[in-house]
Amino acid sequence: EKKEPIDVAYDVDKINALLGIDVSEDEMCKYWEMVDLVPDKAKKCVHVPTWRQDILRLADLAEEVARFYGYDKIPTTLPSGEATQGGVSYQTSICNMIRNVIESYGFSEGMTYSFESPKAFDKLLIPKGDELRKAIEISNPLGVDYSIMRTTPLNGMLTSLSTNYNHRNKDVRLYEMANVYLPESLPLTKLPEEKMMLALGMYGQGDFFDMKGCVEAILDRLGITTGVTYEPKGEHSYLHPGRKADIMMDREVLGYLGEVHPEVADNYNLGTKTYVAVLDVAKLAEKANFDIKYQGVAKFPAVTRDISLVMKKTVLAGQIEEVIRKSGGKLLEDYHLFDIYEGENVGKDEKSLAYSIRFRAKDRTLEDKDVSAVMDKILKKLENLGVALRQ
C-alpha cells in the first residue's frame, strides 16, 4: 500500500514546555529542515516525507529539536508534586477481602486476556441478538482469536478449567477478577462501561451447594447478610436450566451461579460437571456493610423450635426464610434449614423443608406463650405461600 506524506501540527510553547528549554520558532524550523522536514509557519505544521515513518505527532518533532539542541544542554529538574502517605482504596480493600475468603476455600487466582474470539459466543450458546454479543472489535488484532474485547468472563474461566482438565488435574478451583467492556452502542461514540466481575469456576470435589456456600461466605464477609435471595429464573443459556440461580438483593441482581450447561461443557472439552459463579464487584462494594456493633454474651437462655413444612416444589426456601426473618421480630435470633424431603410421604408435586428456629430475649427468660405467639404469626404468613405444617 502506497504511503502518502503527512502534515504534523506543532506548537512552539508546548515543545519548549515538554523539553524544559527556550528555543525560538526559527531555530526549531532550522533543525527540522536539516533532516528534510518541511515546516510551514503559516499553517503551524511540518510536512513529513513518506520515508520518515517515525514522525507522527508533536512529541516526535520535539525529539528532533532535542537532538540538535543537545541533550547535554537540557537542564535537569526534580519531579514536582505533592507527597502523600498513600493508602488502599475502598475498591481495592473490597477485592482483598474477597480474595482472602475465596483462597480460604481452596481457589487459586488466574488471569486471562481481555481479548478473545467472537466464536466464544457460540461456544457459550449465547443467542443471536443478545446484549453480550455486542462486543468492541480491536482495530489491530493479533488474530481472530483476539479480535474483540470480552463482555463476559466465562470464556476465559472455562478455557482455563479446560486446560487443567486436559492436563488431568482432577480437582480444580479457580477465580479471576476480570474486567468486561460493555459498549453503549456500536460503533463506539464514547468510552465503554468497564466493569470488574468476580468469576469463580470449579470441577472435581464439590457441587452446586459448595459453590453457593462460597458465594455466601463472600457476602457474609462483606456484611451482606440480610435480604439476599437465590432465584432460579435467570436466562443464562450457558448454565444448566435446572441448576442455576440469580443472586438477588433488593430486587437487584448481584450475580449468578450454576452448573455449566452440558453442551457448553462439551464445547470446552470438559468431561465432568463444572460449576461457575459470577458477581459484580462494584455492586458488592456498594452493598457492603461494615457497621458492626458489639453484643455482649447472652444473659438469658434461648428457646429452639423445630418445624417441618410441606409445600409445592415451586416454593423457594428463600421465600420461606424471608417470612421467618420478617415475622420473627426482635425475639428471632437465628434459623437454619436442616432437612429436605421428597418422597412417598408427601404429594408427588410437593416437598418438605425442616427448619430449626431459635428465639431469645435480651431482658428476660422467654415463656412458652411468648414463643408460641411468634410461631403462630410465622405460620399464618406462610399460609399465604401455600405452606402448611407437615402432619
Residue ranges: model-predicted function:
Residues 1-7, 45-51, 79-84, 112-125, ...:
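A glycine-rich phosphate-binding loop feature that marks nucleotide/adenosyl-phosphate handling sites
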Residues 2-8, 53-71, 128, 179-186, ...:
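Core structural elements
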Residues 6, 53, 72, 76, ...:
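Flexible, active-site-adjacent loop/turn segments at secondary-structure boundaries
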Residues 8-170, 305, 358-360, 366, ...:
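Extended, well-folded interaction surfaces typified by the phenylalanyl-tRNA synthetase beta subunit core
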Residues 12, 48-50, 140-142, 179, ...:
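Short, structured patches in soluble enzyme cores that scaffold and shape functional sites
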Residues 34-37, 112, 184-187, 193-194, ...:
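A carboxyl-terminal module marker
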Residues 59, 176-177, 256-258:
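Beta-strand scaffold of nucleotide-dependent catalytic cores
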